[in-house]
């Protein structure tokens, strides 16, 4: 770990930070219009981006791009966040059975990325994420409003409109993951802002799920330090 080196991932809706607090890192998020967090020096900031860049003086030479990530069969058009997540999953996951890795990044979108035990990208899927689905219903319908709280009901069929929206969206995301995940052949790793919410629901039915919310940020640190 190098003194005063911090990390930033510019997401689609938020800024994701890893602040160097030796010997560990502090992971947190801010809105794009917020000021730079205290103790973050932009000159020593390693960054990557999948969203619109904020009005910050980010140094081009400090940028990590998809082309910088050494993975087999990695297309240049893949998001750098997906590439970094794959890189870190390969590093941290114990995989003696040589299963394939399925990474579910639960953010603005739910992106699924599958790779072999040897680190070769197979491909993936992308669908609207938890909040994106809720907000799209509010935007494109007359009478639906996005819930302010995200307590997923246990029942399958609800009377309350907000509960019905929450259950429908959570089921849609779990359905995408369940249809793509074969526990006999795959290891499922969940990351991103909504990974603990969706992952906890999946874990009620399947035990062999790894939830690592900061997988991508840890991947940035790993890439830089190696």
Residue locations for each model-derived region?
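Conserved phosphate-binding catalytic cores of ATP/NTP-utilizing and phosphoryl-transfer enzymes
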Residues: 1-2, 70-101, 217-226
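Gly/Thr-rich phosphate-binding beta-strand-loop-beta motif of the actin/hexokinase/Hsp70
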Residues: 1-25, 98-121, 137
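A short, well-structured beta->alpha microelement
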Residues: 21-40
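Short, charged/polar "capping" segments at the starts of alpha-helices
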Residues: 36-37, 52-58, 196-199
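Short glycine-rich phosphate-binding loop at a beta-alpha junction
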Residues: 41-52, 62, 185-194
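Conserved phosphate-binding/catalytic loops in two-lobed NTP-binding clefts
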Residues: 60-72, 203-221
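Glycine-rich phosphate-binding loop plus the immediately following alpha-helix
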Residues: 81-95, 122-167, 223
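Adenine-nucleotide phosphate-binding core of ATP-dependent small-molecule kinases
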Residues: 153-187, 194
């Amino acid at each position: 770990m190098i003194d005063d080196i911090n990390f930033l991932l510019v997401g689609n809706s938020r800024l994701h930070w890893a602040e160097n607090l030796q010997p560990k890192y502090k992971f947190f998020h801010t809105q794009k219009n917020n000021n730079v967090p205290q103790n973050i020096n932009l000159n020593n900031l390693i960054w990557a981006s999948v969203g619109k860049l904020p009005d910050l003086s980010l140094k081009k030479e400090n940028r990590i791009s998809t082309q910088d990530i050494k993975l087999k069969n990695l297309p240049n058009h893949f998001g750098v966040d997906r590439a970094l997540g794959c890189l870190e999953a390969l590093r941290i996951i114990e995989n003696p059975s040589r299963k394939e890795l399925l990474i579910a990044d639960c953010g603005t979108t739910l992106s699924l990325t599958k790779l072999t035990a040897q680190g070769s990208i197979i491909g993936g899927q992308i669908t609207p994420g938890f909040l994106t689905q809720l907000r799209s219903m509010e935007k494109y319908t007359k009478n639906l409003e996005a819930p302010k709280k995200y307590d997923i009901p246990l029942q399958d069929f609800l009377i309350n409109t907000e509960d019905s929206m929450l259950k429908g969206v959570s089921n849609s995301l779990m359905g995408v993951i369940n249809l793509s995940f074969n526990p006999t052949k795959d290891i499922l790793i969940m990351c991103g802002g909504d990974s603990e919410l969706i992952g906890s629901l999946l874990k009620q039915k399947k035990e062999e799920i790894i939830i690592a919310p900061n997988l991508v940020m840890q991947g940035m640190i790993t890439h830089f330090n190696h």
